[in-house]
């Protein structure tokens, strides 16, 4: 009936959107012959093409340098964070493989879990890739990375110097994912 009526569901448009991002940065430098500093901040937001997918990065750094006659000491500290949300719609290829005569929801607006092809057996079915997004899932990650580098250089004379570098780094990760009992991964269990 849908074929005869010219029905053509846009499965490719269902999980997608126009993604627009933004980037901002600020850099400040200053000092004197002996002391110098550099501070920077940046923010980068990327809105993914799949609905519900986005990334936000924030980075900041501070550098201080002392340059004496024989001694040079510099310290650089940087902190970066990343917040990431994956699309609840899953893979785009799942939507590209869908039959255009199927709809993601039934007449009452309820999500359809699986479809059977009218010319195939009852045991041959296709999962609705939109189903899991409609039942409320999320998958988010976040990390914070802190780095510190201290460099010391002592000029013994014009031809020789001694230098040392100490660097420390620490990363904190957090992940949060949720799928309700009605999620397709629990079907039949």
Region roles according to the model:
Residues 25, 159-164:
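Beta-sheet entry/capping signal
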Residues 23-25, 59-61, 147-149, 153:
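Membrane-embedded beta-strand positions in outer-membrane beta-barrel channels/transporters
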Residues 36, 41, 66-68, 77-79, ...:
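Generic alpha-helical hydrophobic packing signal
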């Amino acid at each position: 009936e849908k074929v005869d009526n010219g029905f053509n569901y846009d499965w490719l448009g269902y999980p997608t959107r126009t993604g627009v991002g933004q980037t901002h940065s600020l850099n400040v430098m200053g000092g004197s012959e002996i002391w110098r500093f550099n501070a920077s901040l940046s923010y980068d937001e990327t809105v993914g093409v799949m609905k519900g997918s986005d990334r936000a990065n924030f980075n900041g750094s501070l550098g201080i340098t002392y340059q004496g006659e024989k001694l040079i000491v510099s310290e650089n500290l940087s902190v970066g964070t990343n917040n990431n949300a994956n699309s609840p719609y899953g893979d785009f290829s799942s939507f590209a493989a869908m039959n255009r005569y199927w709809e993601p929801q039934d007449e009452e607006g309820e999500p359809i879990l699986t479809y059977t092809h009218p010319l195939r057996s009852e045991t041959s079915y296709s999962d609705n890739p939109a189903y899991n997004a409609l039942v409320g899932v999320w998958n988010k990650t976040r990390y914070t990375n802190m780095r510190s580098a201290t460099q010391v250089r002592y000029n013994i004379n014009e031809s020789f110097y001694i230098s040392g570098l100490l660097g420390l780094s620490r990363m904190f990760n957090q992940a949060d994912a949720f799928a309700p009992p009605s999620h397709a991964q629990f079907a039949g269990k």
